[in-house]
Every structure is written in structure tokens, then in C-alpha cells.
Amino acid sequence: MQENSPLLQLQNVGYLAGDAKILNNINFSLRAGEFKLITGPSGCGKSTLLKIVASLISPTSGTLLFEGEDVSTLKPEIYRQQVSYCAQTPTLFGDTVYDNLIFPWQIRNRQPDPAIFLDFLERFALPDSILTKNIAELSGGEKQRISLIRNLQFMPKVLLLDEITSALDESNKHNVNEMIHRYVREQNIAVLWVTHDKDEINHADKVITLQPHAGEMQEARYELA
């Protein structure tokens, strides 16, 4: 891939649910280090679009490219190691935080490195002792941070975020947002973030707005007044 070529490209992507047109003629690209938001009213297809980019569902029309290759021709497990998806409600499993953090290592058949765990816990303002904590005892903010750490350990090229702070209080929301922005800037990770949070617009390179009913889009560069 040439330097500064798009990591992701959506070309005329559409999605039908039965006879209902959810998305129509979606076209945009995402480059390394670029930060784009997806906004729009409820029911306009924001989460559906993110799931298509995450390769959790397939578009009914159009093409999704990753580094110039059609995602439908790539092995899903390889693609998802490069394009990481964080849902609005984090799904944690096993008994402890440690169980969740070793999972990315296990699927790669690699020996977990505790030093990496500890570095991420420090970055995301969590104590070392949380590794042995039962996931049922975690707060909403802690669960979301553990989910992010699990997804970021192997530095994906693209991070997909689906309203991940919508259920958090203002203090936790601010902390999680700042941690994400700081880390992705350091690592030059591309971000596609579905959100209703107007404060996040200040961080965006561009804002993709989906229209209701037809699921069509507009893309604009955000400029501070």
C-alpha cells in the first residue's frame, strides 16, 4: 500500500433489511491517523454502517476495501485483528479482568506479556489489582476501559467505536474520551466513531452525517467557529 493511501474505502455501499432501505450509496475513505465521526438521528443506520465496516454483517450492495483489497475476499479473523470494533455495551467474558485481557493473545497463540497489561492499565488509569477483579464487580466506566484495552493491545490500524460513552456519567465519559484521543494520536490509529456527543465534534477531522429513511450521507470537514 502506498504511503497515505486509504486504509478503508466504502464504494457505493448499501444495506437492505427485508424491503427496508437502511443505507444507500455510502462513499468515504479513512486514512491512518484520521478521525471521523458518524452522526445522525436514531434509526438512520449508524450502527449498521459500523457493523459493515467491522465485517460483522455484509453490505447488500457496493464494496468495502481494506488496504485496496475487497474485504469479502479476506479471512475475517485476519481482518478483525487490524480493524477493531468496540460496541456500545462492552461484552466481557470469563470470570476476571485477566481472562479478558489474555484473550487476544490466546487467539494469536502467543504467550501473554504482563508488562503490556500493566502499561495499558496505567494509560487508562486503572490499578494493577483490577486484573484479579471479577467482571461482575466492575463499574460501567471500568468495563468500557477494559474492553478498549482488550481491543488495543495489538495496535489495530483502525478503531471502530459505537457510542461507547453514551451510558457513562460525565466524569467517566470525559476520562475515557481523553484516554482514547491521547492513545490513538500516539499510535497513528484511524478512528471511526458513532456518537451523539456534540463535544466529540471538536476532535474530528470530518463528520459523516447519515440522513433518516434513505440512509444517504453527507461528509464535511468540521471547522471551529
From Swiss-Prot:
Enzyme superclass (EC): translocase
Membrane topology, as annotated: Peripheral membrane protein
Mutant phenotype after disruption: Mutant exhibits increased sensitivity to H(2)O(2) stress.
Annotated Gene3D superfamilies: P-loop containing nucleotide triphosphate hydrolases
Domain ABC transporter: 8-225
Subcellular location(s) of the protein: Cell inner membrane
Record flagged with keyword Transmembrane: no
Molecular function as annotated in GO: ATP binding; ATP hydrolysis activity
Binding site for ATP: 40-47
Gene Ontology biological process: intracellular iron ion homeostasis; iron ion transport
Keyword set, alphabetical order: ATP-binding, Cell inner membrane, Cell membrane, Ion transport, Iron, Iron transport, Membrane, Nucleotide-binding, Translocase, Transport
Superkingdom assignment: Bacteria
Assembly description: The complex is composed of two ATP-binding proteins (FetA) and two transmembrane proteins (FetB).
Family, similarity comment: Belongs to the ABC transporter superfamily.
Protein name: Probable iron export ATP-binding protein FetA
Source species of the chain: Escherichia coli (strain K12)
Lineage, uppermost ranks: Bacteria, Pseudomonadati, Pseudomonadota, Gammaproteobacteria, Enterobacterales
Gene coding for it: fetA
